[in-house]
């Protein structure tokens, strides 16, 4: 029985990156021998065991055979007769098909170390085409490694898989799992570039695919192309280290620009509402978590108002907070501001630009939330107000709190006073 370190841990060690979870393959053993040695069986589809002390995963070497379309259409074979080369041959990419033995010797039958040196993502063999999830994994690794290219033969194979309808059989949960992980990588734009290059983006996210080639006003967007802008926004979000809900909101904020009537281009009047309308079925189709979708919907509807809020007076600011439910959910509003700032910076030449809207909105919300709401309501009741009039009194008190805070003044008003 031989135990060897395999997969991502070997890859990351060779790259000099931090090694996360370590996966092991066991050659020359049976499930009964593993249990007898104290390993805890946990695998559902094939024999996987937890080490009795480290609790790391140890999987018996296996082969797999395609029996039906999609992600689940496989039959696995494990046994003491399955060799290490057999097991490595079923893996997706050469850089993930390496192993280290007990002595620290690298076993690399598919040239993974060479491809690491050349920064190339290359499939191991024809078995890659048997699992459509591997297209998503390939794209995710492109996002993680950033400057790695995809081998031409691998890209061609992915195109054939897409044309054969393999990605159409993917279950939504699996698509979201890989998409969400890719959004959290260092360069999310690379994931979408790879998916687009092989034709998978149009099948999986047609709402995003149609943004490429759609022009925007060059005075606002020097990069012009809406798809290019979206990629810049996603990479800005990654650079700023924001959370998954914020990154998904960035992904969905401009979907409506893909359906702008041609005769009004490059303007995009009303794209906010169209973005929200397209976002809802996309989130439902992918089974996106509620926290991600709700923030994305808010950002889609309100990002233009946030961008333009520098010209809002106190009353307009309070109305914005009303629409965003910022009184009850200030934390979500903060996430929306983060997404809007990524949007503003995700433009050619604006990557390091100041975004004064965010601090002003934070200050205005703090001022409005700082009033004693109970005292305002009690005073209103003492004046004989009730029903909707109580709500209006609270609304006016919030406006007054914002208007009286010097830090919340509009830049134009400050300039007049200073002049």
From Swiss-Prot:
Residues 226-327 form the HD domain. The keyword Transferase applies. It catalyses: a tRNA precursor + 2 CTP + ATP = a tRNA with a 3' CCA end + 3 diphosphate; a tRNA with a 3' CCA end + 2 CTP + ATP = a tRNA with a 3' CCACCA end + 3 diphosphate. Keywords: ATP-binding, Hydrolase, Magnesium, Metal-binding, Multifunctional enzyme, Nickel, Nucleotide-binding, Nucleotidyltransferase, RNA repair, RNA-binding, Transferase, tRNA processing. GO terms for biological process: RNA repair; tRNA 3'-terminal CCA addition. Its cofactor is Mg(2+); Ni(2+). Pfam families: HD, PolyA_pol, PolyA_pol_RNAbd. Monomer. Can also form homodimers and oligomers. Comprises two domains: an N-terminal domain containing the nucleotidyltransferase activity and a C-terminal HD domain associated with both phosphodiesterase and phosphatase activities. A single active site specifically recognizes both ATP and CTP and is responsible for their addition. Belongs to the tRNA nucleotidyltransferase/poly(A) polymerase family. Bacterial CCA-adding enzyme type 1 subfamily. Catalyzes the addition and repair of the essential 3'-terminal CCA sequence in tRNAs without using a nucleic acid template. Adds these three nucleotides in the order of C, C, and A to the tRNA nucleotide-73, using CTP and ATP as substrates and producing inorganic pyrophosphate. tRNA 3'-terminal CCA addition is required both for tRNA processing and repair. Also involved in tRNA surveillance by mediating tandem CCA addition to generate a CCACCA at the 3' terminus of unstable tRNAs. While stable tRNAs receive only 3'-terminal CCA, unstable tRNAs are marked with CCACCA and rapidly degraded. This is Multifunctional CCA protein. It comes from Leptothrix cholodnii (strain ATCC 51168 / LMG 8142 / SP-6).
């Amino acid at each position: 029985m031989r135990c060897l370190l395999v997969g991502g841990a070997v890859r990351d060690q060779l790259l000099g990156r931090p090694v996360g979870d370590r996966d092991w393959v066991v050659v020359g053993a049976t499930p009964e021998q593993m249990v007898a040695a104290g390993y805890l069986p946990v695998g559902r589809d094939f024999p996987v065991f937890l080490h009795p002390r480290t609790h790391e995963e140890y999987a018996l070497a296996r082969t797999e055979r395609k029996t039906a379309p999609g992600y689940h259409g496989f039959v696995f074979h494990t046994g003491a007769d399955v060799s290490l080369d057999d097991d490595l041959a079923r893996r997706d990419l050469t850089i993930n098909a390496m192993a280290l033995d007990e002595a620290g010797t690298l076993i690399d039958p598919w040239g993974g170390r060479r491809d690491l040196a050349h920064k190339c993502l290359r499939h191991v063999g024809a078995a890659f085409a048997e699992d459509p999830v591997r297209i998503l994994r390939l794209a995710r690794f492109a996002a993680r490694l950033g400057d790695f290219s995809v081998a031409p033969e691998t890209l061609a194979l992915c195109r054939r898989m897409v044309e054969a309808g393999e990605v159409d059989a993917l279950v939504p949960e699996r698509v979201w799992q890989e998409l969400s992980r890719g959004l959290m990588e260092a360069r999310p734009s690379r994931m979408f570039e790879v998916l687009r290059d092989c034709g998978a983006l149009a099948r999986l996210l047609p709402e995003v695919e149609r943004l490429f080639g759609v022009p925007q006003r060059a005075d606002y967007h020097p990069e012009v192309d809406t798809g290019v802008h979206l990629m810049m926004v996603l990479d800005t979000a990654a650079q700023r280290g924001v959370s998954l809900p914020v990154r998904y909101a960035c992904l969905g904020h401009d979907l409506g620009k893909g359906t702008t009537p041609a005769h009004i281009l490059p303007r995009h009047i009303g794209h906010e509402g169209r973005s929200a309308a397209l976002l809802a079925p996309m989130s439902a189709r992918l089974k996106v978590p509620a926290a991600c979708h709700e923030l994305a919907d808010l950002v889609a509807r309100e990002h233009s108002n946030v961008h333009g809020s520098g010209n809002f007076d106190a009353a307009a600011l309070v109305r914005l907070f009303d629409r965003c439910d910022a009184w009850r959910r200030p934390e979500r509003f903060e996430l929306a501001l983060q997404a809007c700032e990524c949007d503003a910076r995700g433009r050619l030449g604006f990557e390091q630009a100041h975004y004064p809207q965010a601090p002003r909105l934070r200050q205005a919300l703090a001022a409005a939330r700082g009033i004693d709401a109970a005292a305002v309501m009690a005073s209103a009741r003492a004046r004989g107000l009730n029903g909707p009039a109580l709500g209006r009194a609270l609304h006016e008190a919030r406006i007054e709190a914002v208007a009286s805070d010097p830090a919340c003044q509009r830049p134009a008003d400050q300039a007049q006073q200073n002049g």
